[in-house]
């Protein structure tokens, strides 16, 4: 979003939905979902804005809270402010976008068709692991992919080193993103 001065700022918006409880009595009234938004760079009182919304939904500081996010640093910082039981879940849209970029970079990184096909199979396996909820194995696979890209970068010489180098950096960044 752009303000009047011409600088950029980031808006964080969310919807707080109370969790489902199987053991809740049938006559218990469900709490409605509530929305919140704030501009992180301009709002130094995050706890005064967000925690009352969470508290109105029945949240206590020692309870588990799950945030679905794009994985940006601002949301990761938000987790540390909410409480020790806060957890981040990456949304599939942003994960799939990053995987698509890695696939395209892999196709152009190396003239060796065998290496490229093997890495594309690795990315398909990584995608499968993520889709099926095997986060720890997916992080290991992403780190292995980054190592393979690094190996290709080391073997290349001159101008040919640039594409594997970019692939290695992107793969390493993706592994960090998943952590």
Please place each PLM-identified region on the residue numbering.
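Catalytic center-proximal scaffold of phosphoryl-transfer enzymes
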Residues: 1-179
């Amino acid at each position: 979003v752009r303000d009047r001065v011409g600088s950029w700022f980031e808006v964080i918006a969310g919807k707080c939905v109370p969790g489902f409880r199987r053991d809740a009595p049938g006559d218990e009234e469900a709490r409605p979902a509530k929305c919140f938004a704030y501009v992180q760079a301009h709002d130094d009182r995050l706890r005064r804005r967000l925690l009352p919304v969470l508290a109105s939904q029945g949240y206590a500081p020692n309870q588990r809270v799950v945030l679905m996010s794009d994985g940006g640093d601002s949301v990761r910082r938000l987790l540390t402010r909410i409480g020790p039981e806060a957890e981040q879940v990456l949304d599939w849209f942003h994960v799939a976008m990053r995987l698509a970029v890695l696939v395209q970079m892999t196709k152009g990184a190396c003239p060796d068709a065998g290496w490229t096909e093997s890495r594309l199979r690795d990315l398909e396996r990584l995608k499968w692991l993520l889709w099926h909820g095997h986060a720890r194995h997916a992080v290991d696979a992403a780190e292995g992919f980054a190592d393979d890209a690094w190996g290709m970068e080391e073997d290349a010489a001159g101008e040919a080193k640039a594409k594997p180098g970019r692939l290695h950096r992107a793969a390493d960044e993706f592994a960090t993103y998943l952590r």
